[in-house]
């Protein structure tokens, strides 16, 4: 099938992707579980006035901490590459000839996954290794702190892929005094190292979903590798950041996730974006692969 409206699908992406015609999507962004070997959790807390509370605040007032919501998903696979391979082959099939895949991964599996992508797409179709660098979280004392994710970029056809550098929001020069005033005012095209904060725990963008990615990262990807009206795919949709960025930039989208909680969140989120009040449609189909 070819979609004629934005979709948010609940089910196993390995069952749902074969239902789409080949060469349907201009852009695919995948943020699969990172195989960390642990369960990812996010707890939303609130502090409320309570005379018997366990915390003391301004002028001796007592407060208690309440858990508003908890969410989690498993992030452990016996054979991670065997899990990814059939899904990546399906993603390649549904990409059009000028399409691009962005695969978001971390240091534990990036080198193995790149070899897998070389096999599926071909080494000549490797475009970039993007490093998303941030500075947040714990700092181990017996090794260098890991403060980056890797985004591997592959194209369907190295002679025909779409990349629009002019559409990408530019960033300031690190040393503006070394370039002309005109260049400094215009900014520069980002390199393959993207310095960007994580989603602020207290910011408006926060949804409360574990491992939520910043919209700024997805906006840059959508701007560079798709045009207004193009179809974008995320088959590990999570909180729906790809859908939010795509709709805000005038693209169409299909989001897939096997977690009902993620699908409900993504459905609400994309309903707030898009021209003419366009909202994603929730379709429940397929078998849930993880919760």
Where are these regions (language model features)?
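Positively charged, low-complexity nucleic-acid-binding target-recognition regions
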Residues: 275-291
């Amino acid at each position: 099938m070819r979609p004629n409206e934005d979709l948010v699908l609940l089910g196993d992406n390995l069952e749902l992707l074969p239902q789409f015609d080949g060469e349907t999507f201009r852009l695919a962004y995948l943020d699969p579980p990172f195989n960390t070997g642990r369960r990812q959790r996010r707890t939303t807390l609130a502090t409320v006035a309570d005379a018997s509370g366990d915390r003391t605040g301004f002028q001796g007032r007592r407060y208690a901490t309440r858990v508003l919501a908890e969410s989690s998903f498993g992030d452990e696979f016996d054979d991670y590459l065997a899990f990814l391979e059939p899904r990546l082959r399906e993603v390649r099939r549904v990409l059009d000839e000028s399409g691009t895949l962005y695969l978001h991964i971390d240091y534990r599996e990036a080198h193995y996954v790149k070899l897998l992508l070389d096999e599926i797409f071909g080494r000549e179709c490797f475009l970039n290794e993007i490093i998303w660098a941030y500075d947040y979280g714990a700092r181990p004392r017996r090794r260098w702190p890991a403060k980056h994710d890797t985004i591997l970029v592959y194209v369907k056809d190295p002679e025909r892929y779409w990349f629009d550098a002019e559409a990408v929001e530019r960033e300031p020069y690190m040393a503006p005094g070394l370039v002309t005033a005109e260049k400094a005012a215009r900014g520069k095209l980002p390199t393959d190292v993207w310095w960007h904060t994580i989603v602020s725990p207290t910011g408006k963008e926060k949804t409360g979903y574990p491992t939520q990615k910043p919209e700024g990262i997805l906006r840059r990807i959508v701007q560079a590798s798709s045009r207004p009206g193009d179809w974008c795919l995320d088959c590990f949709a999570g909180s729906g950041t790809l859908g939010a960025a795509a709709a805000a930039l005038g693209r169409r989208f299909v989001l897939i996730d096997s977690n009902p909680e993620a699908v409900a969140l993504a459905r609400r989120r994309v309903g707030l974006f898009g021209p003419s009040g366009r909202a994603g449609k929730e379709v429940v189909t397929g078998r849930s692969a993880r919760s």
